[in-house]
UniProtKB/Swiss-Prot annotation:
Family (UniProt): Belongs to the neurotoxin 19 (CSTX) family. Double-CSTX subfamily.
Location of region: Predicted alpha-helix: 164-177
Name of the protein described by the UniProt record: DELTA-miturgitoxin-Cp1c
Recorded domain comment: The presence of 'disulfide through disulfide knots' structurally defines this protein as a knottin. This toxin contains 2 'disulfide through disulfide knots'.
Signal peptide region: 1-20
BP GO terms, sorted: killing of cells of another organism
Segments carrying motif Processing quadruplet motif: 44-47
Residue stretch(es) of the prosequence: 21-47
Superkingdom, natural source: Eukaryota
Changes after translation: Cleavage of the propeptide depends on the processing quadruplet motif (XXXR, with at least one of X being E).
Keyword DNA repair: no
Length: 183
């Protein structure tokens, strides 16, 4: 009963919002739809430009400041009399965050953009094992000896015992909860 009451009130609210549009709202939407995407216009405009470096003048192009490691620099203006001078600067909070974080390392991509499946050989790609149920599989290597006595490594993507225990406990808990509530 509560469920149907909630959705009926929600439906009426959405219906009211749809029917309460005025002609001005519709004109604004038509204007927005008639122009090309705002983002693509900005990208087309800025493709040919080079950015303005930090501590250089940006009076003529206030949105052309370069990007730091993480954040974009801002054009800060100072007015003296009738003239106004603007310089690309970095905000203090951005400077503190960038100095604390440093360079953001790019995550290494797998060789063929696919992960190594469970129990497959991962000797060459030890960090690219696929994700299991909740956790990512880990590459585990074992020492093997041939008939000649030569040592070789046998590597495979496996799930550690702790991860198996946690996933098993969650499966059992989910089943118990489902059985209790009749699902």
């Amino acid at each position: 009963m509560k469920f149907s009451l909630f959705f009926s009130v929600f439906f009426l609210a959405v219906l009211h919002a749809c029917l309460s549009e005025s002609e001005i709202d519709l004109e604004d939407e038509e204007h927005f739809m008639s122009s090309d995407s705002f983002l693509s216009e900005i990208q087309d405009e800025s493709r040919g430009k080079t950015c303005i470096e930090r501590n250089k003048e940006c009076t003529n192009d206030r949105h052309g400041c370069c990007r730091g490691k993480i954040f974009k620099d801002k054009c800060t203006c100072v007015k003296s009399g009738k003239t106004e001078k603007c310089v690309c600067t970095q905000k203090k909070w951005a400077k503190i965050i960038e100095s604390y974080i440093g360079d953001i390392p790019a995550l290494p991509k797998p060789v063929d953009d696919k992960c190594v499946p469970k129990h497959a050989d991962c000797s060459k790609r030890k960090d690219d094992c696929c994700k299991g149920g909740i956790f990512k599989y880990q590459c585990k290597c074992y020492d093997m000896y041939d008939d000649d006595g030569e040592k070789t490594d046998l590597c495979g993507c496996v799930s550690p015992v702790e991860h198996q225990a946690i996933e098993g406990a969650l499966r059992i808990a989910k089943k118990l909860i489902g059985d209790r509530w009749g699902r």
